[in-house]
Amino acid sequence: MIKGIGIDITEIERVKKAATAHSQFIQHVLTPTELEQYSQFSGQRSVEYLAGRWSLKESFAKAYGTGIGANLGFHDIEIIDNQYGAPIVTKSPYNGNAHASVSHTATLVMTEVILESENK
């Protein structure tokens, strides 16, 4: 059974500006494992990855029902690409299944997270 759906659209340039303006922005958003994956990219692809993780975590927080804040932080959620590049939620406070999807244009990233209970 679906427990929550979260959708987010983020401007890639906005995330790029935040990362440039705030020296700890990337470390604030990405877990150490996500940072490892991020470090494998360069140029526009690294910005897309960062914006994608920001947006995926926002989508997760919306599906979870709390938003990002006092009860749920960016490091409480970890989303790693599998060998095919699909985002997989590897860490979260949610005990059921979490399904994630991400898509980019040249300027935007759109994400969706669906939280599903283990009992169908």
From Swiss-Prot:
Disulfide bonds: none annotated. It comes from Limosilactobacillus reuteri (strain DSM 20016). Belongs to the P-Pant transferase superfamily. AcpS family. Its EC number is 2.7.8.7. InterPro entries: 4-PPantetheinyl_Trfase_dom, 4-PPantetheinyl_Trfase_dom_sf, ACPS, P-Pant_transferase_sf, Ppantetheine-prot_Trfase_dom. One of its GO terms (molecular function) is holo-[acyl-carrier-protein] synthase activity. This is Holo-[acyl-carrier-protein] synthase. Mg(2+) binds at residues 8, 58. Keywords: Cytoplasm, Fatty acid biosynthesis, Fatty acid metabolism, Lipid biosynthesis, Lipid metabolism, Magnesium, Metal-binding, Transferase. Gene3D superfamilies: 4'-phosphopantetheinyl transferase domain. The gene is acpS. It is found in: Cytoplasm. PANTHER family: L-AMINOADIPATE-SEMIALDEHYDE DEHYDROGENASE-PHOSPHOPANTETHEINYL TRANSFERASE, PHOSPHOPANTETHEINE TRANSFERASE. Pfam families: ACPS. Its cofactor is Mg(2+). GO terms for biological process: fatty acid biosynthetic process; lysine biosynthetic process via aminoadipic acid. It catalyses: apo-[ACP] + CoA = holo-[ACP] + adenosine 3',5'-bisphosphate + H(+). It comes from the Bacteria. Transfers the 4'-phosphopantetheine moiety from coenzyme A to a Ser of acyl-carrier-protein. One of its GO terms (cellular component) is cytosol.
